[in-house]
């Protein structure tokens, strides 16, 4: 018996967002300038005018958010002596997944005497979302680096708490090929993760800030002086590494803590303008 066209038809595959963005910065005549730029798919990079010696790059995901099966790859190289600030146009939204992870991979190379600020705005995890994110940084001789990753579990204004969101966030930082710092953050949608006193303790927002440079101990003293007694945060410095971890009940409270910390620790000494919009 001949099958009808309707019986033969199989479900069309869901469209997925894929993108790649690459940028290379070079020091020329005392200022950091664009050397190379490549963008493909949903990844776009914009270079707003800056008035300091650093170059600012804004990463844009034109798909408007990520869900299961989406993939984005970013790569940035700061050549010798250059200063590069990388941020995002807005908060990245991770929507409910049907089973697959959304994947975001970032690779940064910081040349001799160069500095990179990796300052993306917050990532918002929606209920049922799944995100697998990785950050690899290769530092060469005398290179310095500052990074922040902030996560919001749902949107406070909408009464969301994203209790079943899944996150795996992997950081690997190398100095001249040797591993100097590693982070492995995981959320598996378990109740104890949200309420455990040694974990989130009921908070809906958290952030990690990392600064690598020769003045880590000095900056730790300055950082502790700007963290109020009511802030749920811990900071430490070992060798050239300074790490700050913060939890907060809301995204607004989190920003109030991390914005002055980022301004203190960043190579540019200030936040990208998009953080103020």
Swiss-Prot record:
Residues 1-20 are annotated as: Disordered. It is found in: Cytoplasm. UreD, UreF and UreG form a complex that acts as a GTP-hydrolysis-dependent molecular chaperone, activating the urease apoprotein by helping to assemble the nickel containing metallocenter of UreC. The UreE protein probably delivers the nickel. Keywords: Chaperone, Cytoplasm, Nickel insertion. HAMAP family: UreD (MF_01384). InterPro entries: UreD. PANTHER family: UREASE ACCESSORY PROTEIN D (PTHR33643:SF1). GO terms for molecular function: nickel cation binding. The gene is ureD. The keyword Magnesium does not apply. Disulfide bonds: none annotated. It comes from the Bacteria. GO terms for cellular component: cytoplasm. The keyword Transport does not apply. Required for maturation of urease via the functional incorporation of the urease nickel metallocenter. This is Urease accessory protein UreD. Pfam families: UreD. It comes from Chelativorans sp. (strain BNC1). Belongs to the UreD family.
